[in-house]
Amino acid sequence: DFIFPMMQAGAIYEGQYFLGTSIARPLIAKRMVEIARKHRAQAIAHGATGKGNDQVRFELAAAALAPDLEVIAPWRDEDFRNQFPGRKEMIDYCVAKKIPVEASMKKPYSMDRNLLHISFEAGMLEDPWLDASAPRYKGMYKLSVSPEDAPNRPEHVTLDFEKGNCIAVNGKVMSPLKVMQALNRLGGKHG
């Protein structure tokens, strides 16, 4: 419902950036509202920081779908920010409370991952001189492998389309979900 129409529209930000993060927010908000309705909740919450676009995406979608629901945004609460002024404090809290998270002080980046997209963010990753092939960054390859670990041979793939939507990979008819999973596996193993 979201990915294929976005691809058909050629929706790419600044001519190069897939909308993998931004397209997910309305879908997440839609599902949050559905769950809130099912459980007769009066509010929904998101963890978007108060400085990015995600908060706007979540809240506009929620307002359109369920204007009666309160939206709780902890990162806009001063007491919350005083308790957790940065990643270190949040990671320390999670460790103390035995809350499993992938971030650590050695790997202090955040990850956004969904069926279409994966991205990482942290101050050190914004450095254009960063050597992302260094062994310490190998853990960032979640959907793919380092180019050094990818096969040296190309793999030929056929895609079948119907009404602009991919319906088969290598001759095997699949649901949209299975198509995306198959393409992620094929692309991922080639780095």
Regions found by a protein language model. Name each.
Residues 1-191:
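Nucleotide-activated chemistry modules centered on ATP-dependent adenylation/adenylyltransferase
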